[in-house]
UniProtKB/Swiss-Prot annotation:
It is found in: Cytoplasm. Methylates ribosomal protein L11. Belongs to the methyltransferase superfamily. PrmA family. The keyword Cytoplasm applies. This is Ribosomal protein L11 methyltransferase. InterPro entries: Ribosomal_L11_MeTrfase_PrmA, Ribosomal_PrmA_MeTrfase, SAM-dependent_MTases_sf. Transmembrane segments: none annotated.
Amino acid sequence: MPWIQLTLSCSEEHAPQVGDMLMANGAQAVTYRDGADTPIFEPRPGDVILWEHTLATGLFDADADIKAIIANLKQSNIFGSDLQYKVDALEDKDWEREWMDNFHPIQFGENLWICPSWREIPKPEAVNILLDPGMAFGTGTHPTTAMCLRWIDANPPTGKTVVDFGCGSGILGIAALLFKAEHVVGIDIDQQALIATKDNAERNKVGDKFSLYLPSQQPETQVDLVLANVLAGPLRELADTILGFVSPGGQLVLSGILERQIEGVIEAYQPHIKFDTPTIDGDWAMLSGTRVG
């Protein structure tokens, strides 16, 4: 069955609404891509982390009235007469090949890779996460996740207990376990994220060491390392909860923070955390530190 692919250019702020509009107009699937071709492996459930310039692509049946769909989109306050779009016709095999061709093994730090299952592993002796992102998972990795993965690579949590707070696809917890962490507790507000994490952990043969909870069920525990890749707002609002997981002398990694939000997030965790120098990647920042009180 042939398909029609409609790609729209929009801002990060409007991308989730654009995706909703594409689905409301009959799209069978929606993917997001950075306008500069920076891909993503891990979106946030209910709060998609995107980019300053985003391409949202809807996949429609071949008999969809694309002209009418475009006319509908032009009526929105988001686009109006400034709608920028591209229409492509794809055969089934073309869509599948195009989607798969967008995924390649990606290296983080010295010894950590993410590898789609259909690609040859470039470095078998390295730590390799096997991750087959579905269409909703985009086409690569966002800087917030990449910084965390590089931190894990540089600070292997061997023998440590870990909380992956806002686990999403489970990629950070899986990385910790593949670096020989003792156990990971994953927490997320989205049940579908927990299902995805469970599947990904089992694919990487660490499912027996990855316990998963909704916030209402999360255990009262303290661990050696807490990884929280969410957004600055929740990091501030949930500071007491997140701090409660960090054992004395334990480590804390916070990501999903814009550079201009660093000071506000640090204030929420002082005086309990002694932070290292922030890690910066583009407009994004990651904070790491040690619990001192």
